[in-house]
């Protein structure tokens, strides 16, 4: 019984794993071409190799910029070079729509695949509709959710010959009383059925999330459509069939990717900036005397005087990254702004759970102690029963012997 209870407590800890927001260093809107650039087309299309084996929960609200991370433990692996790929999908139920895909080559075996830990990486296939809403940061999916992004995201990872799949159920708060335009998302097309609320009677900080620093209008003038994976608007004048079809989805057995994915040849840092550009260029909803500058100042003030646990997690991420190259830990996690146990995922793409691992190890120790105690108890009972049986047998033999002697004496 003790073992069962300990196992259940361990399972509850694992299934309640939480995560963090994207760190501040990913909230920018200027075009950056730092780091290693991609240099080849992907060798394979994005594929869901097997149905998801893990169910995870995630949350988002306001203008938060989030990272969905596949929690895969690579720390136990050898340093031998391996190839890897990461694919992200959105599950519409009848089909799975690919969102982003990237391949890595010659990666350090016990480090999270990234442009820094791999010899090379492919162009990124991303879903674009004139703007970049999603991109991959190492192995994580980066975006600013709208209220219509609530739903199931699926990750499919191939690490050497090992397959990892999971389902992240994202729940976006429907309160739209924030300055950013939250009326967008993957499920908004065709059937807008999510109730939005503007609850001014329940005041809360509006400057919650990512507010990139304003940039010059010509900053992106030298960036090509090809680098961002955005189709040239001029090409649509001749053939309207080139427009991406949002309903073009994957089945479990599909091995080809549809027109919803475009090949972005720019480096990872450029695509992160493109996501920030979409945030900066969206239709803002200011109230009263609010301006973008006042909102940014308020957001910084909130971070300074009322640090959220997500911000604390980001700081912990930076310190932990120097000690460890971001092992991803137990194959369970979610994004939740009030958790500070996941570290390292900001810069390395997948988070560890050092604090949570300590708790898990404690539970494992309890399971081990309980198992040993039960085994010892069983052995003790068996030995005791054996001794009692031997004693009873000896007594029976002794009585029999005395009776035999009495009969002999009578005779």
From Swiss-Prot:
Any one cellular-component term (Gene Ontology): viral envelope
A Pfam cross-reference name: Herpes_glycop_D
Major place of residence: virion
Disulphide connectivity of cysteines: none
UniProt-annotated stretches for the region Disordered: 306-345
Keywords: Glycoprotein, Membrane, Signal, Transmembrane, Transmembrane helix, Viral envelope protein, Virion
Entry keyword Signal: yes
Protein name: Envelope glycoprotein G
Gene behind this protein: gG
